[in-house]
């Protein structure tokens, strides 16, 4: 295999990431590669021994994940991020989130280590009104995330407090001078 991109360069000076990018670019969008196949082609191109590749493999895999030009496509297949429009990537993420919403959520059963199967023991954990967010005066019952007016009120309240604080600070500075 010969990569025209590296014509005139010494193979020993090339990084595995550079070679991986060149291999994927040459193959094109419809030819994503399994990680193992990609590593084998890199090894063949760079003419490295198995022991050299094994030693460099953890670093290469980390670089592949960190480098922004590669994208994992699932099932250990890799491609170039430039092959995919941002909308395509986002749709895949949204699809996964929608699947999670459809799945029924299981409630976790609370286990009390002190109950130890004793039917006569009193469980004080279920009758504490402070454990519930629905008691009168609760912040969560007054604030509605969906209501933009609540957010506006919160910002105005913060601004008022901030203004008062700066006024007090200025007054204190004048008193000290």
Swiss-Prot record:
At the top level, the lineage of the source is Bacteria
Where does the record place the region Disordered?
Answer: 117-164
Q: Which UniProt keywords apply?
A: DNA-directed RNA polymerase, Nucleotidyltransferase, Transcription, Transferase
Q: Give me the stretches of Acidic residues compositional bias.
A: 117-134, 142-157
HTH HARE-type domain residues: 14-83
Cellular component, GO annotation: DNA-directed RNA polymerase complex
Determine if rRNA-binding is one of this entry's keywords: no
- List, in alphabetical order, the Gene Ontology terms for molecular function in this entry: DNA-directed RNA polymerase activity
Biological process GO annotation list?
DNA-templated transcription; regulation of DNA-templated transcription
Q: Has UniProt tagged this entry with the keyword Transcription?
A: yes
Show the InterPro entries listed in the entry.
Asxl_HARE-HTH (IPR007759), RNAP_delta_N_dom_sf (IPR038087), RpoE (IPR029757)
> Into which family does the record put it?
Belongs to the RpoE family.
**Stated role:** Participates in both the initiation and recycling phases of transcription. In the presence of the delta subunit, RNAP displays an increased specificity of transcription, a decreased affinity for nucleic acids, and an increased efficiency of RNA synthesis because of enhanced recycling.
Please give the subunit comment from the record: RNAP is composed of a core of 2 alpha, a beta and a beta' subunits. The core is associated with a delta subunit and one of several sigma factors.
What NCBIfam families does the entry give? Answer: RNAP_delt_lowGC
Its recorded name reads Probable DNA-directed RNA polymerase subunit delta
């Amino acid at each position: 295999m010969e990569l025209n991109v590296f014509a005139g360069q010494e193979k020993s000076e090339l990084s595995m990431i550079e070679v991986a990018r060149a291999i994927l670019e040459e193959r094109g969008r419809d030819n994503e590669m399994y990680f193992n196949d990609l590593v084998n082609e890199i090894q063949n191109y760079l003419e490295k021994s198995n022991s050299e590749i094994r030693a460099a493999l953890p670093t290469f895999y980390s670089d592949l994940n960190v480098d922004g030009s590669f994208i994992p496509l699932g099932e250990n297949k890799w491609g170039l991020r430039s092959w995919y429009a941002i909308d395509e990537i986002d749709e895949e993420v949204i699809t996964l989130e929608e699947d999670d919403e459809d799945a029924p959520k299981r409630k976790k059963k609370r286990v009390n280590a002190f109950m130890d199967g004793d039917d006569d023991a009193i469980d004080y954990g279920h009758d504490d009104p402070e454990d519930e967010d629905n008691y009168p005066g609760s912040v969560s019952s007054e604030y509605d995330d969906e209501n933009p007016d609540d957010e506006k009120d919160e910002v105005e309240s913060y601004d008022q407090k901030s203004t008062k604080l700066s006024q007090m600070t200025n007054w204190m500075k004048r008193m000290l001078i």
